[in-house]
């Protein structure tokens, strides 16, 4: 049987590129329907001249279908081919068809239908299919996977399309950026978290139909098959740099409020441990003994979820060279009375990772060229974070309002963002729960779309002397700072109106104390350790005051890290050089990644050129040339 492969021009916006470029999953829409004769594949390759390619559906080795599996959202200035190869998302097309058939058979199982033959949709334990996949039978509704009019008809794949053109289900496949262990844990936890949010809290999230946490399934890859939500991204309404007006205020709040509402609902549950959510059978026997939260009255939910190891990003990202055994030493779960263990655990795994990389580099066994001096400085920094981590906070401090509530285990979703919210039928659906974890609210960060770490400007004319006399370029710099301050403030006001008992997280002193930990969670390049060290250095000047006010977990005014003048001078020099390097290097903020349409345009213009070693560079002089005036 022949299938048509269509390469169609992508219609995504730049904001979509941002979402996909840094996600650890690729998404493909799967259309299901009554037995059909063809499967359509569509790539997301940006092309002004779409072309049709034919391939045999049973020929998994056909090179013509490669384009569909390849990463096409963007390109990198360095190691482009290698980074794209890590993001290929191959799966068995036949396997998808077989899985859908299995789902249909499972739905028709007498144990899963009522007397009229309709799906029961009752809450049942996760069921494993014969191919190794898992299915949530309570989500096998006709609405989600389609309905066969003839009871003997087969429910088969109708189409396989890109993220932009499908209709019914979304197939999520992880990029090969993390270890098999990390990917497995991440999938199991994300599915359980979605299940919890849907069944326990009744929130608007996609329903998971089936999943596989490893390659032992019909698709031959880890995957999540879930509900497709039709609608528009909330991001379309977000205009963060709009000038102040009643209309702007209403517009900004129309984006912030639904996200704040969602956070408020997930904060309603106090958990019994720190870690991440899993289904009961996916954690150790020891962890199965502890219920995740108290007071569950629904017998169908009492033993549905448990708390296991954390899948927070830092326990998986760039940890490929650490064995599963070593990772398990650091990723929890942790008891509720040991909240600062989360900080020391992050410091410890980063320290272990840096030592491991240094050892491989010195033995000439590293898989890439390493900067040995940078790795040595990383080790020093994470030793400092390890030393200060358990002393950053006093979890019983009387100087922090409602301190006990702030340190209770709460569910934290790191990707609460209008890019991950779909508006559909007057409802807001939240779609991304990767790396969700249970941690103290005081150790969480604000959503990226409102977070601002720069100097605060609350009133341009009062806070900035001579603002009205400045030229337009200088004014714009301060206006940017003002708008970012305003947006973060709006988020804090929404938090205060819903959870006044948690508003102490807005304290500047709390932000300074947790900054070393949050900086460690935001590592994107090897030199970002400089920001971690900088946050620790900043604490030194305030340490006496924090000890005196019992804010930190130390009774000694002696700073836990002993710095020499030589070290501080070297750190300041390294930090300034790195900041200059970042500012002067195009696309440094994205790690050299460029959206594909922009990449191709700049390449055509001669601004991006390929070098002899296969990398690319930006011709700064070419970029600064003025465009010729049109005649």
From Swiss-Prot:
GO terms for cellular component: mitochondrion. Keywords: Mitochondrion, Transit peptide. Residues 1-41 form a transit peptide. InterPro entries: Kinase-like_dom_sf (IPR011009), Mito_inheritance_9 (IPR051035). SUPFAM superfamilies: Protein kinase-like (PK-like). It is found in: Mitochondrion. The keyword Mitochondrion applies. Belongs to the AIM9 family. This is Altered inheritance of mitochondria protein 9, mitochondrial. It comes from Scheffersomyces stipitis (strain ATCC 58785 / CBS 6054 / NBRC 10063 / NRRL Y-11545).
């Amino acid at each position: 049987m022949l299938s048509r492969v269509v390469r169609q021009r992508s219609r995504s916006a730049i904001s979509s590129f941002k979402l996909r470029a840094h996600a650890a999953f690729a998404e493909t829409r799967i259309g299901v329907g009554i037995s059909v004769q063809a499967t359509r594949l569509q790539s997301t390759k940006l092309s002004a001249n779409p072309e049709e390619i034919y391939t045999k559906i049973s020929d998994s080795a056909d090179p013509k279908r490669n384009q569909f599996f390849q990463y096409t959202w963007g390109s990198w200035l360095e190691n482009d081919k290698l980074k794209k190869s890590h993001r290929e998302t191959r799966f068995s097309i036949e396997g998808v068809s077989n899985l859908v058939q299995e789902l249909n058979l499972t739905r028709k199982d007498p144990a899963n239908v009522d007397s009229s033959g309709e799906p029961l949709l009752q809450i049942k334990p996760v069921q494993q299919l014969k191919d190794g996949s898992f299915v949530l039978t309570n989500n096998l509704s006709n609405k989600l996977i389609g309905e066969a009019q003839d009871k003997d008809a087969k429910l088969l794949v109708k189409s396989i399309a890109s993220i932009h053109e499908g209709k019914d289900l979304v197939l999520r496949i992880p990029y090969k950026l993390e270890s098999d262990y990390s990917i497995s844990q991440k999938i199991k936890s994300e599915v359980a978290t979605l299940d919890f949010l849907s069944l326990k809290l009744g929130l608007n999230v996609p329903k998971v139909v089936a999943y596989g946490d490893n390659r032992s399934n019909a698709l031959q890859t880890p995957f999540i098959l879930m509900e497709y939500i039709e609608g528009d991204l909330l991001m379309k309404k977000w205009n963060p740099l709009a000038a102040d007006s009643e209309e702007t205020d209403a517009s900004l709040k129309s984006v912030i409020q639904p996200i704040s509402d969602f956070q408020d609902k997930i904060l309603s549950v106090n958990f019994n441990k720190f870690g991440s959510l899993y289904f009961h059978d996916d954690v150790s026997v020891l962890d199965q003994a502890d219920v995740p939260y108290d007071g569950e009255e629904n017998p169908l939910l009492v033993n549905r979820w448990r708390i296991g190891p954390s899948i927070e990003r830092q326990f998986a990202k760039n940890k490929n060279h650490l064995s599963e055994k070593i990772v398990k030493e650091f990723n929890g779960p942790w008891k509720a009375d040991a909240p600062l263990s989360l900080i020391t655990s992050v410091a410890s795994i980063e320290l272990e990772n840096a030592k491991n990389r240094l050892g491989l580099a010195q033995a000439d066994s590293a898989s890439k060229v390493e900067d040995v001096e940078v790795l040595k400085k990383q080790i020093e920094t994470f030793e400092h974070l390890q030393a200060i981590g358990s002393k950053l906070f006093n979890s019983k401090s009387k100087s922090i309002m409602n301190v006990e509530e702030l340190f209770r285990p709460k569910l934290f979703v790191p990707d609460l963002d209008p890019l991950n919210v779909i508006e559909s039928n007057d409802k807001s659906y939240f779609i991304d729960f990767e790396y969700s974890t249970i941690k103290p609210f005081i150790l969480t960060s604000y959503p990226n779309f409102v977070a601002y770490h720069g100097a605060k400007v609350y009133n341009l004319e009062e806070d900035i002397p001579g603002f009205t006399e400045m030229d337009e370029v200088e004014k714009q710099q301060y206006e940017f700072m003002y708008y970012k301050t305003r947006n973060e403030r709006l988020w804090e006001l929404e938090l205060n109106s819903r959870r006044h008992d948690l508003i102490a997280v807005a304290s500047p002193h709390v932000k300074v104390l947790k900054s070393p930990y949050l900086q460690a969670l935001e590592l994107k390049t090897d030199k970002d350790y400089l920001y971690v060290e900088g946050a620790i250095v900043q604490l030194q000047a305030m340490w006496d005051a924090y000890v005196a006010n019992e804010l930190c977990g130390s009774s000694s005014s002696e700073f836990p890290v002993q710095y020499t003048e030589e070290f501080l001078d070297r750190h300041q020099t390294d930090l300034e050089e790195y900041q200059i390097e970042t500012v002067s290097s195009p696309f440094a903020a994205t790690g050299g990644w460029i959206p594909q349409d922009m990449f191709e345009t700049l390449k055509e213009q001669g601004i991006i050129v390929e070098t002899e070693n296969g990398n690319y560079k930006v011709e700064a002089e070419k970029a600064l040339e003025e465009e010729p005036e049109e005649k």
